[in-house]
Amino acid sequence: EEEEVDAYFVKVPVEKVFSEPEQDYAQRIADSLKRVGVSVVQIEDFDCSDEFLENHNITKTELSSIITDFLGKLTRKIVDLQELILVSVGGETSYKCCHSLDSKNLQLIDEVEPAIPLCLDYNSQWVITKSGNLGNPKTLINIVKYLEQHK
């Protein structure tokens, strides 16, 4: 049985991560949060081939850092436009997004699923972090359902 959640998907071409996040992305996501309630940002055309890395004169580690920096900056722009509950996937992504929001101390409020915390920072910013390789194919859907049940 396949479960679905209404969500707005924003696919950002990997080439865009080499510059500042465009305000258009932030505005589209903020608007979609008002309409749909769930927005997903995904880096598309993610090519980690040796050729891609050579063409950009970077290593895999540097590309990963560039992507997470971009996502952190985009998160800041979105939060400036719209209140939200941040759900981030991946340790480095979570760190960069929280850092961009100045969320240095997170207080554990609940556990959405095993090892997936619901936290609150001193600015009343809600944050859910999920390790990149933790969970199963339904984990993100379960997080959305948890949030819907606890509105």
Residue ranges: model-predicted function:
Residues 1-151:
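Active-site catalytic microenvironments in core metabolic enzymes, especially phosphate/sugar-handling
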